[in-house]
Amino acid sequence: MKLMVTRRMTPAAEHALSARFDTTIMDRTDGLTEAEAAAAMAEYDAVMPTLGDRFSAGAFRPGLRCRLLANFGAGYNHIDVEAAAHAGIAVTNTPDAVTEATADIALTLILMTARRAGEGERLLRRGEWTGWQPTQLLGRHVAGCTVGIIGMGRIGKAIARRCHFGFGMQVLFHNRSVVSALDFPARQVEGLDELLTQSDFAVVAVPGGAGTRHMIGTHELERLGPRSFI
């Protein structure tokens, strides 16, 4: 089977794929254009794409050889799944591959913002740090604050667990459907306005796509308190 992998992977993953398939691994950092996606599906039995590769409706043309798009990542909004199905091409994804890593990054961003870590690093790299001062780069506490999770899916739950168990934070969340049987205390709120007005930190953990585009705009930002972060 001929397989195209659209980005570099870890050495172990590349070795495993090459040992099993006739594998071509693209050495690039930008995504495939629609024309390149169409050409890949015409030449290969399977393609392993990821975010940024444009498998939009126009890429699914007559006479394609490809029968599988094995997406690397949970999100697949860069693939027109309806067009793929019409062309007889199966689409798979990896729902839990990056759940924990994404939640770690969310907590990293919360801590960096609250404790002004980015500012401190830039100060140090500029050679301007002259020693500790009582009021230097004062941030705010994270422990005991309220976090609002927008989207309580796998990633949202992983973020909420870290916030509650790691920092004793109160957890609010907004989700399009009712979420129950959580293994940590949390309160679901009906609207974004209610969540944002009560949150010290708000985290967006929803899939990308037309349904969530512009979810956060001027109105939502104005609901945040003067010392809140999103």
Provide a role label for each language-model segment.
Residues 135-226:
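Rossmann-like dinucleotide/phosphate-binding beta-alpha-beta segment
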Residues 23-30, 46-49, 126, 178-185, ...:
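Short, flexible loop segments at the rims of nucleotide/cofactor-binding pockets, characterized by
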Residues 87, 95-146, 158-166:
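Phosphate-binding beta-alpha-beta segment of Rossmann-like dinucleotide-binding domains, i.e.
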Residues 68, 201, 229:
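Short glycine-centered segments of the SAM/dcSAM-binding site in methyltransferase folds
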Residues 1-92, 197, 217:
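An N-terminal-biased, well-structured beta-alpha scaffold segment characteristic
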Residues 32-35, 50, 71, 93-104, ...:
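Residues at secondary-structure transition points
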Residues 85-97, 225-229:
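Rossmann-fold dehydrogenase core element
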